[in-house]
Every structure is written in C-alpha cells, then in structure tokens.
C-alpha cells in the first residue's frame, strides 16, 4: 500500500510561511526601508494604490515589501486592509480644472491655452539600460535642480471645454439628483450605470485594462480616439465640514486624467430637441501616475457606452467581470486547492458511462452471436 | 365559426416616429418611410382574421412588412400599436400583446410554432437535431426521456428525416433537413397556429417542392392553422385558400386566392401576378 | 489594529441584511457588495464574509475543506477567524454551532441550532447553458429552466446518462434553480427538508443564497433517468472500515479503485474511536 495521508497539514502550512520569510530575506543584507520603496518605486506604488483603491503610498510600500515585490499580491493586501476600515465620510466632487499640474499634454491641438507641459515623462527617452545605476551611491546621485512641482497652480481650461463652447463635443449628461454608484457598498447588477463602470475600470488591473483597450484600438471595437488631454497632478480632497457644512480641503491625491475625443455621432439635445453632430468623450481617471492605464480606460469608457454591442470589448459583462485583479488572480489561484471530492464525483460519472457503453457493446455482440 | 386569431390595426415603426405615423392611417409616401419624420413604417393598419385549420398567405416584396407581422404575432417583435386577440388560452379571448412573460412563453412554446427561412433563427446549433425538438416538450414540463424520444422520433419519421441523422447537430444537416427539423420543432407540442416565414426560401427547386408538399399534407392531416409568408405567389397559391397582399407596410388587397390571382384589383397585385405566372 | 471579526460593523450589518433576504427567498441569489478579504477571492471569501458577519463571541466554530478540518484552505480560514475573534474552534461536528465548509456537508446530520455556511465558487447553475448574467437573471425571474433540462436530455442522448457530477443543480422550494457549490451528489439529499439552515456565499461573484430549514430541495432529473448519488458499493474506508460515507480514492500501486478513505475526517476519527 502506498502512502496514505490521513489529514491535511496544519504544520506544513506554518512551515511554508516560515520558508517564505526565509526567501524574502535569504541573502541577508540590509532590509529595504519602506520609505525607500515609497520614494524610489514611485510608479509601482502608484499601480498598487490604483488597483488597491486606497490612496496610501505608505501602506502600499509595506505591502510591496511584504510580498517580495509582487504588485498583484500587494494590491490584494491593500484591498483587504481597506475592507477593515470603516467609512467615516464622503469627499465631495471636485472639478479637475483645480488640479495642480505636473504634466499636461494634448495630441489634438499644438497650441493650447497655458501650453503643453511635458513634465516628468519617459515618452521621449531612449530605452537603453543605464548600467551606471549599478554603482549608484548616495554621493554619486546627481539630483536635478529642484523643480517646483506645481508649476501651474491656477485653474487651466480644458481642451474638451474649448470644443464644448463651439458645440462640437457632447455635454456631460448630468442628473444632479442622481448619487454616484458605489461599487464597494452596492451590489453589481448589469447593466451598470456609467459611474459604476468607471469605478470598475479605474480599479482594474493595469495589464487587463491595457489589453482590453488595445483590443478595441486594433479593431475588436470601434474606438480610435484622439487624446484631448493627458493631465497628471494633484487633486484636492474636500469634505463638508461636519458642523459648518462648508467644503474643507483635507488632503490631496495624485491622479492621471485622460479625456479622449472619440468618433462623432448625431445627438439630440434633450431640452431643445435640436439635432447636431458632436464628438463623443471617453474618460479615464486613475490614482497615481499611470498614463497608459488612464488612456486605455478612456477607450473602454467609450466602448462600453455602445448601445448595441457588436464586439466583446463593447460588452459590459465581458469587460467588467474580467478586469479586476482580485477576482481573476483569486479564482485562477484557487485551482491549486484540493478538488478531491468533486474530482471523485467526476470519476464516478466517467466510469459509470464507460461501464454502460461496455454493457451495450457486450449485448450487441451477444445478439450477433445469436443471429 | 369564430376566428382563432384576430389582428387589429397592428403597427410597427422603426425609428423615433411622429404624431402622424404613430396615429391611425398615417400619410402614405412613395416608399415605406414616413414622409414627415422619415421613420420606417414596417407595418400599419394591419387587420385580418385567421380561422382554425386554415392556411392564410401573406405575399409581398421584401420590405413590405410581411415578416414583421409574423414577428409581432410570435411576440418576438415589440409593437407600437394595435391588438392581437387569441382565443385558445385558458383564460378565454385575450389580447396577447398584453400578457405576462410566462404566458408569452407558453404561447410561443405550446400554442404557436414558427419556421424561419434562416435555420439559425429557428434552431439551436449547439445541441442535436433531436434535442432541438425535445426542448419544446421539456419546456412544456415533459420529463420522461423515453416518452419524449418516442414522440420526437415519430415526428421525425413523419417529416421524413432519416433516422441515422436524428442525433446529428444542425450544422451537419442539408438545408432541406434543417427545415424538416424546424417543422418538427414547430409541430411537437400540437400548436393551434404555425407561422411560416419563407420556409423554402433558400432551397433548390426539387427540395422546395418536397417541403411544400410536406407542409400541405401536414396542414390537412393535423388541421392546424398556418400563416405562410412568401414573396413567391406560386408558393402561396399552392398552399393557401386566402391571401393578403402587402406593400409598404400596409395591406393593399385580400381575398380568396383564386379570386385575387384571376382578378387582381390593385396595380401592384397585377404586376405581382403577371410577373410570376405566365 | 483590527475590529472584532475583521470587517467593520457597517459592512457586517449590510451582509446580514443580504442573508436575511436570502432566507426569505429560498434559492434566490441575492447580489451583495462583496468585500476583499485577507484571503484570495475564490478561496472561500463568500463563506468567510457570512461567517464573519454572523459570528459572536460564544460561537463554537468548525471549518473544514473537502471534509477535512486540517486541509490548507480550512486551516487558513480558521486561523484568520480565530486571530480576529478568539472564538473556540473545534473539529467535532456535533458540538460546533457555526460550521463553514468547502464542498462537503458533514456525514453526521446537523440539527436546528447549527448553521452550515458553504463556500461557493460559481453560484449560477445556469452558467453551464448561458454565459450572460442578464439572461440568466431573466430565466430565473420567469422560471424558464427549459435549457437546463435540454442539457440533461442531450446527456442521456449522447452518453446514456446524466453526466453532471458535483455541483448538481437543484430546484429549491419548487421555484429557484440553485447551484450546490460543488458538493458531491452524495450530499445533495442532505439539503432536502433539513433541520438546519444552509447559507451559501460567493465572494468573487458577489452573491448570497440560502436554504432555510425544512425546505424542499429537489435534484433536477428526468423521470426515467433519476438522480443518483456516487456509487461506493463494495468499497470501504481503509481506516474506519465505514461503508456509509463519501470516500476519496487513494492512488496506490495495487491499481485504480482499490483503496479508499473517508472524506469527512471527523466522522472517520469518531468511527475509529468507537
């Protein structure tokens, strides 16, 4: 008789955890400082903030350290932490014109009011590995002259508003009575309204948002936008003062905002009934500095507005059910769990069917013999 | 004799519609568009009766609204006006445009059967031919495999489907066989009305003749009422005692088939008759 | 650092409301705003959210995975619940008040003061025949389950048998078709007219549903192809010699189907102690 395990292994699980700790620090050396991760892994931290949907660079940095740099696992930790924190109040809507910009470009017009601000961007860099970084020390670092991060600190008119003034861009359909959906507190049922779709998208996994957006751009969908504006900067977080009921700024968050100009369509003004041709808008907004995700999100926002979906990317259920990192990695990983019982049940079926087949085959051959 | 089905002032508009085309007797134009708002008038002011056991023909060119009428009766196309009275529901004569979802499915599944020109509309290509027909009985709460299978096989023999092909998937059937399976599917729950939407449209002539022959013998044998839609007046003449001629979404002429074909009143009907029968 | 039973109180209350609704409409999947937990989605977060929302300080908890109290998933969940609540944990089915399970119902019959919480990966029984949520919602609303019976018919037609193995669909209270999580067919009859309450949680798919005590639960079947549980005739557990429990096959050099052991480890242990 072969090896027969009686029970699963609680001890083994505890040992596995110790082993993980060993691997995390296996080469000895100085443990990474959380503050270093936070400061020097800026874009990675931003990804975790965005997918974890909790604006805390510090918590994200700890999570990243704990998970040996696995961003998916780290953002999972952040989301789980988020579930333990009570919601004490809501921030009130802010206008993104109020953003303190560190970067702002437009691909639709060369000369825009306040100009194009390239800011910190690798868009034009050569993708060459800089081997000298291997020998970088705190003394050899040559920090560039300190920039004032908030170069533009007064409201800057948006390119889409410029188009709106000319009647060329759809106005947002605002219903002041309607509260935005909250996908962390309300069940998701399809069809989802736009505010809920945008929330699913902005929490979506970087790579998944990118892949779906790319598919639309390549022809599995019909959105091929011109970017009105990419804005990176800090937005104020405002709440209503609990006593005075007046807006108070309590902090700021870095975000990337993208407005895409998409194909034009015939629209009827709901109030005047006038018909006109107007561009449609695709909107992307993500926590942190992540331009490709925000652009892809703007494509998906537009694609999911399709009234009669013809491609998977225009299908709400297809895109929004499969874009979340927590749901996809969790379910894929669960395949590693024991499935002994259900597999035993499947074995029972396949053997029973095979036995039945054999019976029929034997019957048939016996009949033949009789003949 | 009381009618099985009475259609009154049926209207279907594609587009936004306006007061004129949404109202009774909209202004006619040179085509099936509303001359005021440009919406498509798929059908309007369509009124007719169907009697138990009769085969009624609807003829007209493509875009005349004949298939729309079938879709409205089968409750798959939402209408913009009118009523459809049906006499065989347990609750008596009912306007079937106003029934709840469950009654709607009972009507579609048990009381009516439909055969489409395009087999992809009528058959589920992911299950066997036999499963397609069995589905209708299963939906009607039959739960005995052997009993269902026997009934399906009998019907397959009646529509002359070769027994070696019962378990095949629709994709492997010829066009004629697909229509035979659709006919079996329409018949399985002994409906009181069968809707035939150009059932022999895409078939070659010899197969077409066999299928028409089958439909004719079934209608006599089972005494089931049928509405047959076709652009081909020959097909209609073969099967139908009464005929309706449609153009631009409206009924322009109706009557006994022999009368309409021998003595067409409308210019359009005359063209239709003379262009197809020499 | 963390609240009792991890989740904040408002979230727990919200989940309890969904549980109440689920009990009121047996077999109906109540959508809820599922939270992310320190356990992966797909690893029992639905069951865990129900357990965390219901658990009180006096509860005696049993968590088991595939019948095994010591299996990885069960150990994980148990440690988390214990860490955040400090409740007493047992492997004894009889003395537990709140039981959370992955894919098994205990061999020992549960009583009216026990609640069994089941972890559900795929709550939608119609997903096998329809991939779209909006369409399955309509099918449930209209009790339009014809497609599911067609699946059974096609099974018999092509294979001579119903091929559904675990996660066997059942009709609850003669109204809603319900997925059985995948428990094996062996456990399905235990749902019918049971003394205890069954709660089902699907975290990733964000649904909660329930079978209240003394509710009719009927496995889907055709009249002449009746529902049948797994066949373990002429087989027995290698440890406790039981012939009346769900057995897991143990691959061995002697060949397939030779050695079996109880899937329910508590049941097996008690049998051996007797």
Question: Model-derived features: where do they sit?
Answer:
Chain B
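A short, surface-exposed alpha-helical micro-motif characterized by mixed small hydrophobic
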Residues: 236-238
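Helix-to-loop junction immediately C-terminal to a conserved catalytic motif
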Residues: 74
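ABC ATPase "signature
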Residues: 254-255
